[in-house]
Amino acid sequence: MSEMTPREIVHELDRHIIGQAEAKRAVAIALRNRWRRMQLSNELRQEVAPKNILMIGPTGVGKTEIARRLAKLANAPFIKVEATKFTEVGYVGKEVDTIIRDLTDMALKMMREQEMEKVRFRAHEAAEERVLDVLLPPARSNWGEAEKSETGTHTRQIFRKKLREGELDDKEIEIDVAAPQMGVEIMAPPGMEEMTNQLQGLFQNMSAGNTHKRKLKVKDALKQLVEEEAGRLLNPEELKEKTIHAVENNGIVFIDEFDKICKRGESSGPDVSREGVQRDLLPLIEGCTVNTKHGMVRTDHILFIASGAFQIAKPSDLIPELQGRLPIRVELKNLTVDDFERILTEPNASLTEQYQALMATEQVKIEFTAEGIRSIAEAAWQVNERTENIGARRLHTVLEKLMEDISYDAADNAGQLFSIDAEYVNRYLGALIEDEDLSRFIL
C-alpha cells in the first residue's frame, strides 16, 4: 500500500481537486493510519480499528473526485459503490455483502497483476521458447524424440536475436493457446450468491486446460503467450491468501449517496431500501465475516468512507448505531466564483487544457484570456444560484455551450486562432444567463 505522508497525499490531491482542505486532510490521515497500523506488533495491530469517515456536502463539490483520486494513490484494494443500489436482505436487489465480494474480486485482479509483474521475465523467456519451437520445429529422430545439433542451436540463436529485435513481428504463426473460459451468467434469488459463485466456478473449471489453435502475428502471439506463461507460474492458493490479507488490512470502501438511505418522515410501510439497508450495513462497518468465493473475509479493519449531500435528510436521521460507526465528520463547502476560476485553470488536465488539446487535433488554436475565464466562472456560478446548484459540473455544461460553434466548424477553420475573452463569453452566454427559463433548459 501507499507509504505517502498526509502532506504528500494532500499535495497530490491538490493537483486535481480545488479547495476542500478539511476533507483532504481527513482522508489523508485515514490513509496514513492504514500504513501506521501495519508497522505495529501483531497483538496491538488487531486492536487498532479504522476511524470511518462521513463526508457531507452538496453535489459537485468534489466528494466523488476525492474518492476517485484516492483510489489511485492508495495502491490498496478500493471499491466505490452507491448506497441506493442495495436493499434489505430478502428483497429484490443487491445485498450489502456483495460490496465485500466485489472488493475481493477487484483485489484479486490487482494482486494477480502485481504478482505477474514479478514473474514476467521468466514468462517472457518461456514464451520466446514456444514461439521459436513453432518457427523452428526441432528435428526428430526415428523414435520421434527431439534431436539437438550445433547447426540447429546456432540457427535458433539467430532467430532469437531477430525475434528480440522485432524483425519477425509481422510474420504469422499458428500456436496452441488456452481456450477462453466459459462465461456463464446465473440469475440467483437473494441470499443464494454463494451457490451462484460455486456453479459459475464449476462451469469455468469444465473449460480449464482446453487449448485451441490460433493464427496470429508473432508480436501478438508473444504477448498472449507471456500472459499464459505468467499465469502458470503463479500459485492460485497463495494468490488468494495474499488477496484476503490485503482486503482485510488495507481495503477501502467508498459508499456514495449515503443520504439516500436515511428514513424521511414517519411511514408505516416497510422501508426496504433505507433503514433496512442501514441495519444491514451496521455489522459490515462494525466488523463481521463475509463468505466470498476466494475465502472468508473479516471486515474489522476495512476503512469505510461514506458521502452524501444531506440536503433533505440530515446525518442525525441515520440510525444512532450507524452514526457511532462513522466518528469522523467532514463538511465540504459550496464552491465560489474564485473556486470555479481555479478549477478552469489550475488542476492537471484542466477543462480549458482539455478543450485546447481537442481542438489542436484539427489544427485549431484556442486561447482563454484571464477575463474570459473569469466570465465563464461567473456565468456558471450565476446559473447555479438561480436554478439548481450542481457545483463544478455546471462548468462542463457552460463550456460545452460556449465551444459549440467552434467544435462544429473546426474542420473548416484549420490554422485559425480563437480567443475566448469576456466579450466572446457574453455574446454566447449573456442572453441565456439573464433568461432564467432558458438557462433551466439549456445550461
From Swiss-Prot:
Q: Which GO terms describe its biological process?
A: protein unfolding; proteolysis involved in protein catabolic process
Q: Where in or outside the cell?
A: Cytoplasm
Keywords, alphabetical: ATP-binding, Chaperone, Cytoplasm, Nucleotide-binding, Stress response
The GO terms describing molecular function are: ATP binding; ATP hydrolysis activity; peptidase activity; proteasome-activating activity
Pfam families in the cross-refs: AAA, AAA_2
Record-level GO cellular component terms = HslUV protease complex
- InterPro entries annotated for this entry? AAA+_ATPase, ATP-dep_Clp_protease_ClpX, ATPase_AAA_core, Clp_ATPase_C, HslU, P-loop_NTPase
Positions annotated to bind ATP: I18, G60, V61, G62, K63, T64, E65, D256, E321, R393
Briefly, what is this protein's role? ATPase subunit of a proteasome-like degradation complex; this subunit has chaperone activity. The binding of ATP and its subsequent hydrolysis by HslU are essential for unfolding of protein substrates subsequently hydrolyzed by HslV. HslU recognizes the N-terminal part of its protein substrates and unfolds these before they are guided to HslV for hydrolysis.
PANTHER family found in the cross-reference section: ATP-DEPENDENT CLP PROTEASE ATP-BINDING SUBUNIT CLPX-LIKE, MITOCHONDRIAL-RELATED, ATP-DEPENDENT PROTEASE ATPASE SUBUNIT HSLU
Subunit structure, interactors included: A double ring-shaped homohexamer of HslV is capped on each side by a ring-shaped HslU homohexamer. The assembly of the HslU/HslV complex is dependent on binding of ATP.
| Family designation | Belongs to the ClpX chaperone family. HslU subfamily.
Name by which UniProt lists this protein: ATP-dependent protease ATPase subunit HslU
User: What is the primary gene name for this protein?
Assistant: hslU
